[in-house]
């Protein structure tokens, strides 16, 4: 099965977040490659291209470690990126109020409670 570039970018970003969430630092391309399933599903050159694109989109930062090896870190956490994506969807809608109303209607009671709590804190 072939994957689209967007799917590969998401897979690489999720692998990077998983490594960061486990406490890893100075994450190199080989670390990310080892995290992606199934093993051997993408070539190192493909991974480096995807990481470069994610850097261009300002989703990932790269820097040289010891002036030689490249290491990568996400610009936003997984949760921050999810929130940014939701905001982008709302801002792109012709009727954001209706989108929010439909979204809230589909939430579980627990998530609705968390949303109410967040809105109260925002006042």
Please provide the spans of the model-predicted regions.
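Short helix-coil junctions and helix-kink-helix linkers
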Residues: 34-42
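Glycine-centered, phosphate/nucleic-acid-interacting loop/turn motifs that mediate DNA/RNA or nucleotide
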Residues: 58
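Short, hydrophobic-biased segments on the C-terminal half of alpha helices
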Residues: 48-52
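Short acidic, hydrophobic short linear motifs in intrinsically disordered regions
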Residues: 22-35
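Amphipathic alpha-helical dimerization/coiled-coil segments
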Residues: 84-123
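Short, cationic-aromatic polyanion-contact patches
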Residues: 65-85
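Short alpha-helical segments that sit at the start of domains
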Residues: 1-15, 19, 77
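Short beta-strand "wing" residues that participate in macromolecule-binding interfaces
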Residues: 62
């Amino acid at each position: 099965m072939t994957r689209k570039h967007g799917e590969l970018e998401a897979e690489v970003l999720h692998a990077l977040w998983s490594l960061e969430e486990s406490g890893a630092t100075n994450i190199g391309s080989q670390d990310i490659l080892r995290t992606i399933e199934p093993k051997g599903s993408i070539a190192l050159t493909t991974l480096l291209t995807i990481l470069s694109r994610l850097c261009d989109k300002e989703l990932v930062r790269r820097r040289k470690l010891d002036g030689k090896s490249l290491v990568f870190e996400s610009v936003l956490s997984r949760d921050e990126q999810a929130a940014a994506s939701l905001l982008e969807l709302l801002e792109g809608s012709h009727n954001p109020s209706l989108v929010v109303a439909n979204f809230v209607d589909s939430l579980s009671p627990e998530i609705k409670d968390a949303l109410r709590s967040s809105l109260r804190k925002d006042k």
